[in-house]
UniProtKB/Swiss-Prot annotation:
Residues 31-654 are extracellular. Phosphorylated. Autophosphorylates. Residues 668-703 are cytoplasmic. The chain crosses the membrane at residues 655-667. Residues 1-30 form the signal peptide. GO terms for cellular component: endoplasmic reticulum membrane; endosome membrane; Golgi membrane; nuclear membrane; nucleus; plasma membrane. The modification Phosphothreonine is found at residues 687, 702. This is Epidermal growth factor receptor. Belongs to the protein kinase superfamily. Tyr protein kinase family. EGF receptor subfamily. Its EC number is 2.7.10.1. It catalyses: L-tyrosyl-[protein] + ATP = O-phospho-L-tyrosyl-[protein] + ADP + H(+).
Length: 703
C-alpha cells in the first residue's frame, strides 16, 4: 500500500504538517547542536590573579549548555556579572561553588548533575564558605529552580552565613536516596531574615522569593506505579524510565533530561551501535544509523580534537595500549601491535642538548621508547663514570632499555660495550636509522673498537642516509657477509668495514651464516640472524618448510612466510594430503574445530547478537555442527529447530500459576458446597414449615 508524503498534501492540513515537520527538524538540530564545554578540575586552586581567574571562568562557560567534567565557580568578587552561567543545563561531574563574595549565582537553567566525578569523593553539589571575612558580603541567592536530579553523589552546604532558602529545598526529591549519599546541610544561622516561599509553592518548598522560584517536585509526589520521575500525582503522569529531572509526557521523547544517553530528542539506554550482525553474510556490517557516544549524547561525528575508540566513544586521548591514527578522515584509537610508540629525545635534543654520551644519569629517560628523535652515542666514559660531573659508571644491565627502540632519527655510534657481550643485543629490534644527523657529518652507523663477535642487528631494514663504519672490532665476524646496499636508500651511501676479524679465522671457528640463510648474508649465528631466508620464514626464524601437513601449530604458506592457521580450524591428521587451512582467518579452514556459521568457523553459534532493526540473533548447532537460525518465537535462544527447540520457560511462573489456580479452585468448590448446604437447609426449613401447617389443619379441636 502506498503512503502519501505529507509534503505533497494540499490545503491547510498539508501546510500544518509541513510546519510541524520543519519545527521537528529545527528541534532535532537544536538538540544535536547543544554547545558543550570541557569544565575544570582545579578544586579550590586560584588560577593566577583574581581578574585572570574570573576571565578564565567567563571564557570557559560563556554560552555553554553541557559541562563535560566539573563546574567550578570559585573566587568571584562582589558585583561581578555571572549571567553567562544561565545557559548551563547539565553538568557531567560535580558542581563546586566556593569562596565567592558575589550576591547571586544564577544557575537557573541547570536541570541535572550527573556526578560522574564527585567532589571530595562524596559530593555532587558543594556550596562552601561563600562570604567575605567581614561577613558583610557573600552569597545570598542560589536560584537553581530547575535542578530536579542528582544522579550520583550527595550535597554539602556549609559555612554560607548570607545564603538563604537552602533549607526550604526538599533535597530528597533531587538526590538518589537509594544510593545513600553523604549529605551535609549546615544552613545559615539567620534564617528568620530570609524570604518566605510564595504561598503557591508546594508544601513551602522553594529556591527563593517569588512564585518563579518554587521548587518543582518530580519524585516524592509520584504514584506508586512510577519507576522514576513524574509530572503529577496520578499514574498517567509517570515519566518514561529513561527520563531524568522530569518530563512533559509519558514517552522517552518527552524527557527534560536523559538518564543515560540522548539520541536527537529521544532518551535511550545506549547509542545506536556502529555495527550490526548480518544474518545473510554472517558478518558484522556497518550500521548506517550508528552513532558515537559523546558524554551523555549520541552524535554522528565526534567533535573536533576528539578521537574515536573501538567501542564508539569520543575521547580526548587514546588508552596506553592504543595509538592515534587517521582513517578515512576520522581520527581513531587503533590497537597497538605490541608496545605502543613512545617518542623520546636523543643526544643533542631537548634535555640532552650538550650531552656527549648515554650515561647512568640519562639512560632511564629512554625507558619504553620506540622512537628516538636525535642520536644515540655510547662512549667509553659511559662505563667509566665521570668524577668531575659525579656521574657513576653505567650498569650494563641498563642497556636493556633500548630493546624497545625501533627507529633512530639521527645516528647510532657505539664505541664502548660490555666486554662479555657477544653482540649488540640491546638493539635487536631496531628497524630504521634515518641518518638525519650524522657523526662527523658522514656516518649514520658506527661500531668501533668493541669485543663483540657479531652485530646482532637482525631487525634492521633501512639506513636512510649516511655511511656506515664497522672498524677495529677484533672478534667481529659476519659483517662482511652482508649486502649493505640493500639497506641503503641512496646510491651515494658507502661502507667502511675494516680491521675486524680475519674472514678465514671466522670460517675456521664456524662463525659463518646458517645454511637456512640466503646468500645475502646474516647478522650473526643461527637461523634467527639471517638477513633473508633461503626457504621459508616463521616470524624471525628461517625454516626449511612450513607446518602444512604436520607439526604444531599448523600453517599455510604465503610469500615464503609460514603463517598460522586460525585457532578455529580443526587440525587435519587423517591423511598425508590434508591441509588444515588455505589462508588466514576462520573462513579458510578445511574443517572447523567447533561450529560453522555460514562460511566462518566459530567457537560458538551467535547467541543474542544484535542484528537488524534492534533484533537479537539466536542460533543453534545442528547435528553437523552448522549454526542454524532459531524459530522467531524463541526469544532466549534454542536447542533445536521449530518451537520445540525453544527452552522451557522458568518453572517459577508455572508453579505460581498452579498455586493461584489451585487456590481459585478451592474457593470455587468451597462456595459451591456452601451454596449447596444453604439451599439444602432452606429446603428442609420450608418442608418442616409445610408439615407443621398441615398438622395444624388436620388436628381436631379440643373441647
Amino acid at each position: 500500500m502506498g503512503v502519501r508524503s505529507p509534503l505533497s498534501a494540499s490545503g491547510p492540513r498539508g501546510a500544518a504538517v509541513l510546519v510541524l515537520l520543519l519545527l521537528g527538524v529545527a528541534l532535532c538540530s537544536a538538540v544535536e547542536e547543544k554547545k558543550v564545554c570541557q569544565g575544570t578540575n582545579n578544586k579550590l586552586t586560584q588560577l593566577g590573579h583574581v581578574e585572570d581567574h574570573f576571565t578564565s571562568l567567563q571564557r570557559m562557560y560563556n554560552n555553554c549548555e553541557v559541562v563535560l567534567s566539573n563546574l567550578e565557580i570559585t573566587y568571584v568578587e562582589h558585583n561581578r556579572d555571572l549571567t553567562f552561567l544561565k545557559t548551563i543545563q547539565e553538568v557531567a561531574g560535580y558542581v563546586l561553588i566556593a569562596l565567592n563574595m558575589v550576591d547571586v549565582i544564577p544557575l537557573e537553567n541547570l536541570q541535572i548533575i550527573r556526578g560522574n566525578v564527585l567532589y571530595d569523593n562524596s559530593f555532587a553539589l558543594a556550596v562552601l564558605s561563600n562570604y567575605h571575612m567581614n561577613k558583610t558580603q557573600g552569597l545570598r541567592e542560589l536560584p537553581m529552580k530547575r535542578l530536579s536530579e542528582i544522579l550520583n553523589g550527595g550535597v554539602k552546604i556549609s559555612n554560607n552565613p548570607k545564603l538563604c532558602n537552602m533549607d526550604t529545598v526538599l533535597w530528597n526529591d533531587i538526590i538518589d536516596t537509594s544510593r545513600k549519599p553523604l549529605t551535609v546541610l549546615d544552613f545559615a544561622s539567620n534564617l528568620s531574615s530570609c524570604p518566605k516561599c510564595h504561598p503557591n509553592c508546594t508544601e513551602d518548598h522553594c529556591w527563593g522569593a517569588g512564585e518563579q522560584n518554587c521548587q518543582t517536585l518530580t519524585k516524592v509526589i509520584c504514584a506508586q506505579q512510577c519507576s522514576g520521575r513524574c509530572r503529577g500525582k496520578v499514574p498517567s503522569d509517570c515519566c518514561h524510565n529513561q527520563c531524568a529531572a522530569g518530563c512533559t509526557g509519558p514517552r522517552e521523547s518527552d524527557c527534560l533530561a536523559c538518564r543515560k544517553f540522548r539520541d536527537d530528542a529521544t532518551c535511550k539506554d545506549t547509542c545506536p551501535p556502529l555495527v550490526l550482525y548480518n544474518p545473510t553474510t554472517y558478518q558484522m556490517d556497518v550500521n548506517p544509523e550508528g552513532k558515537y557516544s559523546f558524554g551523555a549524547t549520541c552524535v554522528r561525528e565526534c567533535p573536533h580534537n576528539y578521537v574515536v575508540t573501538d567501542h564508539g566513544s569520543c575521547v580526548r586521548s587514546c588508552n596506553t595500549d592504543t595509538y592515534e591514527v587517521e582513517e578515512n578522515g576520522v581520527r581513531k584509537c587503533k590497537k597497538c601491535d605490541g608496545l605502543c610508540s613512545k617518542v623520546c629525545n636523543g643526544i643533542g635534543i631537548g634535555e640532552l642538548k650538550g650531552i656527549l654520551s648515554i650515561n647512568a644519569t640519562n639512560i632511564d629517560s629512554f625507558k619504553n621508547c620506540t622512537k628516538i628523535n636525535g642520536d644515540v652515542s655510547i662512549l667509553p666514559v659511559a662505563f667509566l663514570g665521570d668524577a668531575f660531573t659525579k656521574t657513576l659508571p653505567l650498569d650494563p644491565k641498563k642497556l636493556d632499555v633500548f630493546r624497545t627502540v625501533k627507529e633512530i632519527s639521527g645516528f647510532l655510534l657505539i664505541q664502548a660495550w660490555p666486554d662479555n657481550a657477544t653482540d649488540l643485543y640491546a638493539f635487536e629490534n631496531l628497524e630504521i636509522i634515518r641518518g638525519r644527523t650524522k657523526q662527523h657529518g658522514q656516518y649514520s652507523l658506527a661500531v668501533v673498537n668493541l669485543k663483540i663477535q657479531s652485530l646482532g642487528l637482525r631487525s634492521l631494514k633501512e639506513i636512510s642516509d649516511g655511511d656506515i663504519a664497522i672498524m677495529k672490532n677484533k672478534n667481529l665476524c659476519y659483517a662482511d657477509t652482508m649486502n649493505w646496499r640493500s639497506l641503503f636508500a641512496t646510491q651515494s651511501q658507502k661502507t667502511k668495514i675494516i680491521q675486524n676479524r680475519n674472514k678465514n679465522d671466522c670460517t675456521a671457528d664456524r662463525h659463518v651464516c646458517d645454511p637456512l640463510c640466503s646468500d645475502v648474508g646474516c647478522w650473526g649465528p643461527g637461523p634467527f640472524h639471517c638477513f633473508s631466508c633461503r626457504f621459508f620464514s616463521r616470524q624471525k626464524e628461517c625454516v626449511k618448510q612450513c607446518n602444512i601437513l604436520q607439526g604444531e601449530p599448523r600453517e599455510f604458506e604465503r610469500d615464503s612466510k609460514c603463517l598460522p592457521c586460525h585457532s578455529e580450524c580443526l587440525v587435519q591428521n587423517s591423511t598425508a594430503y590434508n591441509t588444515t587451512c588455505s589462508g588466514p582467518g576462520p573462513d579458510h579452514c578445511m574443517k572447523c574445530a567447533h561450529f560453522i556459521d555460514g562460511p566462518h568457523c566459530v567457537k560458538a553459534c551467535p547467541a543474542g547478537v544484535l542484528g537488524e532493526n534492534d533484533t537479537l540473533v539466536w542460533k543453534y548447532a545442528d547435528a553437523n555442527a552448522v549454526c542454524q537460525l532459531c524459530h522467531p518465537n524463541c526469544t532466549r535462544g534454542c536447542k533445536g529447530p521449530g518451537l520445540e527447540g525453544c527452552p522451557n520457560g522458568s518453572k517459577t511462573p508455572s508453579i505460581a500459576a498452579g498455586v493461584v489456580g489451585g487456590l481459585l479452585c478451592l474457593v470455587v468448590v468451597g462456595l459451591g458446597i456452601g451454596l449447596y448446604l444453604r439451599r439444602r437447609h432452606i429446603v428442609r426449613k420450608r418442608t418442616l414449615r409445610r408439615l407443621l401447617q398441615e398438622r395444624e389443619l388436620v388436628e381436631p379441636l379440643t373441647p
